[in-house]
């Protein structure tokens, strides 16, 4: 259909040109014939074929009008052809989209386009693609940063929860320890306020004297066999152990009961010396600590007697 339209337009243009050519030839022949036959009463200027001024002006106007109408007619004739060419280009572009790489959007490059304009449009298209890539990269960075922030926040919340549980556990342990020490202190007071086996009834001064003797006996002997301690104060071994634990709970004495049934008394000054040694040395092995403890802690009895350690 497009080919037929183009052929028709070309034939029409050809007919117009041929008609104009014949008309021009006919006018030329008429003027030549008139010049060849001089007429009476006709000025010599007209007989010689020299046109009048009015004729000259009219001819100029006709030529000017023809020159003005020629581009419009050519444009009107070329418009269908251009439309047909554009249609063919669109179909070729569609075929290229299906069978090959897609032409970038905004880069419609006409074959008749100048090299300078083509380069300008290509540069503009390149900038557009670069902006799109930068926007894509920016979005990717935002997504990555948001993910990292979420993971960091989750880790911080987990660490905060662990720390909170640790503090809560320490608080509960401290409260439990204080409660237990208070109960042991109350038991000790009750034990020394009632009559027990091995002690005669007496007034408060005698009880305080007995307690002071009990404590001094431990301090003097340093290492006390629990059975000997119970025998010295006419107590059962379990009662002696409980009283030592009560005295430890209220801070009257410090020491440790080993697995051989002995209580080893350590003074506050000796504990401070051991703590100072550990602080000065930093990390201390068990062997070094044992060796230094033998030097810093004096286990020699102050006085020996009937109830001293064997």
From Swiss-Prot:
Residue ranges, annotated region (Disordered): 31-52, 91-157
Cytoplasmic side of membrane: 24-310
Single GO cellular component term: endoplasmic reticulum membrane
Predominant place of localization: endoplasmic reticulum
Pfam family, one: DDRGK
Lumenal side: 1-2
Domain of life: Eukaryota
Transmembrane intervals: 3-23
Subcellular location as annotated: Endoplasmic reticulum membrane
Keyword Acetylation listed: no
Keyword line: Endoplasmic reticulum, Membrane, Transmembrane, Transmembrane helix, Ubl conjugation pathway
GO molecular function, one term: ubiquitin-like protein ligase binding
Keyword Ligase among record annotations: no
Family annotation (SMART domains): DDRGK
SUPFAM superfamilies: Winged helix' DNA-binding domain
Subunit structure: Interacts with Atg9; the interaction is transient.
Family of the protein in this entry: Belongs to the DDRGK1 family.
Role according to the record: Substrate adapter for ufmylation, the covalent attachment of the ubiquitin-like modifier UFM1 to substrate proteins. Required for ufmylation of Atg9; protects the nervous system during aging, possibly by stabilizing Atg9 and supporting its function.
Name by which UniProt lists this protein: DDRGK domain-containing protein 1
Organism: Drosophila mojavensis (Fruit fly)
Organism classification: Eukaryota, Metazoa, Ecdysozoa, Arthropoda, Hexapoda
């Amino acid at each position: 259909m497009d080919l037929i339209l183009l052929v028709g337009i070309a034939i029409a243009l050809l007919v117009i040109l041929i008609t104009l050519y014949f008309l021009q030839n006919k006018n030329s022949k008429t003027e030549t014939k008139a010049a060849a036959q001089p007429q009476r009463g006709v000025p010599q200027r007209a007989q010689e074929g020299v046109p009048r001024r009015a004729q000259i002006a009219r001819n100029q106007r006709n030529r000017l009008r023809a020159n003005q109408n020629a581009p419009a007619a050519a444009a009107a004739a070329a418009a269908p052809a251009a439309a047909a060419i554009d249609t063919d280009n669109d179909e070729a572009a569609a075929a290229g989209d299906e069978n090959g790489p897609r032409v970038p959007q905004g880069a419609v490059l006409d074959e008749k386009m100048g090299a300078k304009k083509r380069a300008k449009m290509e540069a503009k298209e390149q900038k557009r693609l670069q902006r799109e890539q930068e926007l894509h990269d920016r979005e990717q960075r935002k997504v990555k940063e948001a993910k990292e922030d979420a993971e960091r926040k989750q880790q911080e919340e987990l660490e905060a929860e662990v720390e909170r549980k640790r503090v809560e556990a320490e608080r509960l342990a401290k409260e439990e320890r204080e409660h237990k020490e208070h109960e042991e202190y109350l038991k000790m007071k009750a034990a020394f306020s009632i009559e027990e086996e091995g002690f005669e009834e007496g007034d408060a001064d005698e009880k305080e004297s007995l307690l002071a003797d009990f404590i001094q006996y431990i301090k003097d002997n340093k290492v006390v066999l629990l059975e000997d301690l119970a025998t010295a104060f006419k107590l059962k071994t379990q009662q002696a152990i409980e009283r030592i634990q009560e005295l430890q709970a209220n801070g009257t004495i410090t020491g440790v009961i080993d697995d051989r049934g002995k209580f080893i008394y350590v003074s506050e000054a000796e504990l401070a010396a051991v703590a100072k040694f550990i602080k000065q040395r930093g990390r201390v092995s068990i062997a070094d600590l044992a060796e230094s403890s033998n030097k810093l802690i004096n286990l020699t009895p102050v006085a020996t007697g009937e109830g001293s350690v064997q």
